[in-house]
Amino acid sequence: MTDQVKLSQYSAILLENARHYGVTDEDVLTAIRTGDLAALSQAEREHYTYEAFLSYAKEHGEELERAVQEGYRITFNTNNGLKNWIAITFDLKPGIDFNAAEGLVDGLILTGEQAEKLRKSLASNWHIADEIDTADGHKELTLRLRGM
């Protein structure tokens, strides 16, 4: 068994942003293997550019290819970073679909599969403080910053 891939919050958000805007995992893998970022250009937005995506990952020893194929754990989540990662990854709107405050995310309703992805990806400085099964088979989650 191999260790779980660790990704910075920066790389995780860029990866999920690409997926959110329709870039397939195969296209992401091709970009990683060839260095040709053209396929990622459709996901570029004001704060999400891919110019440094591969060089940042290489410089920080991130295994992007394995992260795409096997999943990953974020090394550290900031409040805003976690809020943005949740919004992009699960196509949710902060303040509407979930609440995010200092050291707290609540009212987050996910499918079982989404909850599992969150559980596997969430940085260790956060934890799932509460999980309630909803009547329609979803999970309502409360996340807290450790130590708060």
Where are these regions (language model features)?
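Structural boundary micro-motifs
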Residues: 1-148
